[in-house]
């Protein structure tokens, strides 16, 4: 192994992960999700309405919004007010798609759930941390509906988590931090279920290419990370 990780981790090692449940008072579900130095506040809000195209269908809806605080990065970023950047739109669509895959919208009934992911501090992996924390916030919100008698059982079908994997000097590394993300020739974001079925794979090469064998290594490493993240999600939710 030629590349030495700045924080001393092994290639297959996650950064320290923590879920601080019920971080805010008024949302149906909330969690401060931390992955190393990346911190994302994820909240789930439930409203008794659906988009017009679902009226009368008996089916619910889930969507997501993603933002970064101006001071989340080393240099202050301007707030996105009237128009969202292409990056922000792409990320919030990814979060929404990923979390819709794990919920039975028919069983939810005609309700809408909004997952808000606000990045308080960014050290790479903000979209993957948003998905992983967003699932926890969603599960907390649905548990409240069950406790209030508004749902008989949870419409969640399976856990969802996401992780990044990158190739640096030809070797795969799990859960990149910012210095590694900047150094990586190949960068992947992988979203999986608790059963390790794939939901989404995003991968790009910069000034290089990768082989099918390296792609398999990347997905194998992602599986290890997802398995650990789902276990941590379950541990956190068991204490709710």
From Swiss-Prot:
According to the UniProt entry, where is the signal peptide? none
The reaction(s) annotated as catalysed by this protein in its Swiss-Prot or TrEMBL entry are: tRNA(n+1) + phosphate = tRNA(n) + a ribonucleoside 5'-diphosphate
An example molecular function term from Gene Ontology annotations: tRNA binding
Q: Which GO terms describe its biological process?
A: rRNA catabolic process; rRNA processing; tRNA processing
- Positions of phosphate binding: 87, 125-127
What EC identifiers does the entry list? 2.7.7.56
| Pfam families the UniProt entry points to | RNase_PH, RNase_PH_C
Family matches, as PANTHER family: EXOSOME COMPLEX COMPONENT (PTHR11953), EXOSOME COMPLEX COMPONENT RRP41 (PTHR11953:SF0)
The family line of this record is: Belongs to the RNase PH family.
Designated name of the protein: Ribonuclease PH
Write the lineage as a comma-separated list: Bacteria, Bacillati, Cyanobacteriota, Cyanophyceae, Oscillatoriophycideae
